[in-house]
Structures are given as C-alpha cells and as structure tokens.
C-alpha cells in the first residue's frame, strides 16, 4: 500500500516512541528524527482546539528553517493537547503538577486534540482530530501508583491511554483511540494516500 510514496524520504519529526509505533503500523518506511528545539508557545487567546495544529505547523517550520528539508523529504509533525474546562493540560513539569492534572481528569470527560502537518518542499497539508475520553474516579492511591510506576511526564495531560491507567480508568472513548495516543493514523493514512496520488 501507499506505493506512490516510495519516491519520498518520509521523516517523522518527533521523539515520541508512541508516534513511531503508530506510524510503523501503516507499513511504510520512514526515519524518525528529533525536532530542532522550539518553544511550544502559542498566541494568547488562540482557541485551545487550534493550538495543536498551530504547534504542528511551528515544528514543521522549525525543521525547514534549519535546512533539514531535502527535495525528497516528506515530513510528518504532530502535537497533541488535552483540554478540560476550556484549558489546555500540557506535559507536566513535575510529579505535583502531574497529580493535579490527574485529579482534574478524574471522574470526568475531557477532549484530546492532535494536529498533524505533512510537509514537502513548500507545500504543507494540515489537519486535526478530536476525541472525547471519559475517566472513572481515580483514588489518590491509584494516582500515586501510576505516577510512581509509569512517570508520564512526557505526555499531555499526564497519562498514556495505552498504559495501566488506561486499563483501569478509561470508561469510554468517543472518536479515535490512536488520536489519544498521539497520532490519528486513519486520517494520516488517507492524507498520505491522497498526497501520493496527486504529486
């Protein structure tokens, strides 16, 4: 599948092992490269649902500005945020903040949005995906256990749906499960397929 993409050097511009795992599931050859250091800042007042797409575009531009885009490069960048009460929960700075985030999510439904950019030369295709996740109530003991064993400090909202906490606490997911992991691969597949056919 996706034979039309064989002429491209596909690069996943992300350090995330989860995104690497998910992209591998599409059975395409790609290289994973760490992104140039960028501040994940966004304009004040920007709609929270638009933030991940904004950041995915910023990552692509950072990659391009460093001269890391060759003519054959097809770059995939992404960013995921957790939104609750209209506020973004990013990656926690420390254990205390992670615990506070999990207590906020406990017993409630929150939104997970991932923005994705596919960049080639000066063309960029961008899209986003939204899922709703409902958590059961989490006890302090469960939160402490999860933070001690899994240390989710590299994850938006302080949790990984594919980890222990996902098994014991997630009651319902409306939308893409893989989007919550960090990459809506069903949409990405269709975009890559369309890109390969039109270029």
From Swiss-Prot:
CDD domains: Maf
GO CC aspect terms: cytoplasm
Annotated compartments: Cytoplasm
Gene Ontology MF annotations: dTTP diphosphatase activity; UTP diphosphatase activity
Originating organism: Porphyromonas gingivalis (strain ATCC 33277 / DSM 20709 / CIP 103683 / JCM 12257 / NCTC 11834 / 2561)
Database matches in SUPFAM superfamilies: ITPase-like
Keyword Cytoplasm: yes
Biological-process GO terms, alphabetical: nucleotide metabolic process
InterPro entries: ITPase-like_fam, Maf-like
Annotated site residue numbers, Important for substrate specificity: 18, 80, 162
Residue positions of the active site: 79 (proton acceptor)
Protein name: dTTP/UTP pyrophosphatase
Family to which this protein belongs: Belongs to the Maf family. YhdE subfamily.
Cofactor list: a divalent metal cation
Entry keyword set: Cytoplasm, Hydrolase, Nucleotide metabolism
EC number of this enzyme: 3.6.1.9
Reactions it catalyzes: dTTP + H2O = dTMP + diphosphate + H(+); UTP + H2O = UMP + diphosphate + H(+)
Role played: Nucleoside triphosphate pyrophosphatase that hydrolyzes dTTP and UTP. May have a dual role in cell division arrest and in preventing the incorporation of modified nucleotides into cellular nucleic acids.
Statement: the UniProt record of this protein carries the keyword Lipid metabolism: no
């Amino acid at each position: 599948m996706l034979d039309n993409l064989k002429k491209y050097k596909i690069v996943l511009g992300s350090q995330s092992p989860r995104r690497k795992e998910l992209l591998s599931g599409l059975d395409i050859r790609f290289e994973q490269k760490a992104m140039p250091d960028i501040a994940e800042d966004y304009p004040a007042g920007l709609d929270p649902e638009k933030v991940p797409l904004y950041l995915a575009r910023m990552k692509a531009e950072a990659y391009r500005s460093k001269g890391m885009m060759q003519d054959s490069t097809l770059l995939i960048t992404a960013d995921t945020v957790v939104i609750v009460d209209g506020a973004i929960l990013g990656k926690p700075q420390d254990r205390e903040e992670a615990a506070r985030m999990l207590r906020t999510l406990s017993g409630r439904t929150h939104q997970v949005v991932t923005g994705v950019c596919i960049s080639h030369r000066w063309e960029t295709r961008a899209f986003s995906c939204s899922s709703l996740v409902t958590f059961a109530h989490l006890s302090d003991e469960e939160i402490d256990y999860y933070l001690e064993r899994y240390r989710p400090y590299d994850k938006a909202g302080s949790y990984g749906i594919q980890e222990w906490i996902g098994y014991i606490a997630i009651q319902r997911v409306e939308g893409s499960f893989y989007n919550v992991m960090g990459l809506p691969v069903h949409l990405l597949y269709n975009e890559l397929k369309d890109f390969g056919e039109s270029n």
